[in-house]
Amino acid sequence: MLAFVSGFLLDCLFGDPYWMPHPVRFMGNLISFLDKKLMGEKHKGEEKKADAPNGAGVKDDATIRSERRKGILLVICVLAATAIVSGIIFLGAYAIHPIAGFVVEAIMTYQILAARCLQKESTKVYTALKKNDLLGARYAVSMIVGRDTNVLDEAGVARAAVETVAESTSDGVIAPMLYTALGGPVLGMIYKAVNTMDSMVGYKSSRYLYFGRAAAKLDDVINWVPARISALLLIAGSAFLSV
């Protein structure tokens, strides 16, 4: 528990410096590698929504089943690699010395959480809006959302920021804290792996509609409880601040 609290305090103090290697980057590289190996190179039009013109078109049943199986294989490989690597690091550190284990556990917990990063990036949006700097606000919000922000007005920028903060409070703070508290940093890393897969392949596009289905569904399941806890906390916070 002390290592968990220490990791949380490290996140609050330092956030995620851009220069620091982060496990999510390695997870992302592995997912991209497996995506390419299982689905081949990306082609023009594959990122369009499946129901968009020139999108997925019609895929036969055999192709659908094949892509779903590949998606399940992706999930298994990424979760297995995450569990093995993080488990070796975690258990290996404690095998060397309890103090080494404590330090490694605190650092792993620190890297699992993203509270300070979320606060820092969302504050940039707020500051730009307070200065009536719409271009700056659009740029700042583009760093935390996955949509085109060039056409957003002030209300649109604010709405996008609030929506992202609400969602990221769940999958960047509450859910990682919950799973790390329940199963230590190894389970916390597994959660981050699922969340990263969903953010990379969990789209209803031509390429990922079936391939990314397993990752997207698993992400929905593991976020069901944390999302509701986050909603209650956000409602309570809004009432407390009279927002």
Could you tell me what each predicted segment is?
Residues 195:
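Substrate/ligand-engaging "lid" and interaction regions
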Residues 199:
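Glycine-rich phosphate/dinucleotide-binding loop and adjoining beta-alpha-beta core of small-molecule
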Residues 1-189, 202-243:
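Hydrophobic alpha-helical transmembrane segments
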